[in-house]
Amino acid sequence: MKQARPYPQVVVTRKAARSLKAGHPWVFEGEVVRMEPAADGTAISNGCVVDVFEENGTWQGAGLISQNSKIRVRMVTRNANDRIDEAFWARRVAWAWQHRRVAMGGRALPGCEPDTNCCRMVFSEADGMPGLIVDRYEHVLVTQVGTVGMERLRPVIYPLLLKTLQEDGQNVCAIYERNDSPARAKEGLPQYKGWWQGEGAEVPETPRIMVVENGLKFDLDIENSQKTGFFLDQKYNRRAVRELAGGRRVLDCFCHVGPFGLNAAAGGAEFVRCVDVSQTAIDLAAANARLNGLDTSMGFTCANVLEYLPELARDRKRLREEGGPFDLIVLDPPAFTKSRGTVEHASKGYREINYAAMRLLPRGGYLATCSCSHFMTTELLKRAIADAAHQANVQLKQIEERQQAPDHPILWGAPETHYLDFLTFQVV
């Protein structure tokens, strides 16, 4: 017999219940047995809070329903004493911020550390707020909402974000929404972006922000940049490259706006070559180098890395013109796969770019290589790198294995929240 609960009800299969008990936060479309109104007759509406029950009547938790999505329910609590009201979300926001306080350097801010004014404040399921991403850049929050449940909660959660930070002495006064992701169509949501003009929010004159990370400055256009603006998940990995770069000639592939390359230059690299297929990204990377006074030791090339690396291996004159030979190569490609169906193709892509990089490295040289897709597991990435090493006839010594920064926490039971791997090797 089901216990009395205040919300409409979703009854799920035994398999779904096992998954929820193991900590996974999603109920999929095919796992729903039936849906029922609440005890008071309240019907289910898209994005509302629902109670989730196993067929035997056991309560599994409460979540937000997405009636247009294959992910039908995203869980928000397994505590039967929780009531999903404004106070509930206030606690979630406060917990998320306090975690950043602890994990990213205590109370030394503005931002998260003395040399940094940015961090990820909310990381969706990992912070108990499924469908919500919040990045903090100095005085501005940049948000991305990906579910209908969070879309409905914007008027509740946005003021809580500002209030939580301001009560902690943080100079945060504005929210910029980047709800222009095509993925919103899966939830039946429109795309839009712009300043949120709700309770307690200011509207700055410009969407440009000066981001400081690891003591380096980046001129960021939050209106037109990728996703929520800056890839904050690589912060400590960039610092690791800085520590390795002293006296070396560095090739930064898929450089975006230059954060890996600038960290290498700041770490005392003899020379850094940054490469990206986007001319806009290259121009921004060069501008950021000038902003930090590092441009004299850096060069910038607009090229397709998948073609550029083999060309350097074939043409030693071009290699010298580009600043080589290089003894540290950084590979930070975009996600090669966004679904299980393309993992095999992605593995081939990772194998090819790592093979091409290994061909350029001398004995004693270093390779820092990344993957940012949770479908490409750590084991699959290592297998692709091992295959590349075999093909290149080199032996690798693993120096370090890292993941995403701690402001992107990994929720155990939800492998989707572990998506970034960063591996450093030396050719021996």
What are these model-derived regions, one by one?
Residues M1-E138:
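Non-catalytic accessory regions of SAM-dependent methyltransferases
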Residues V257-E270:
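Conserved SAM-binding loop of SAM-dependent methyltransferases across substrates and taxa
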Residues F271-D276:
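Conserved SAM-binding motif I beta-strand of class I
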Residues T280-V330:
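S-adenosyl-L-methionine
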Residues F326-A356:
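Mobile active-site "lid"/loop adjacent to the S-adenosyl-L-methionine
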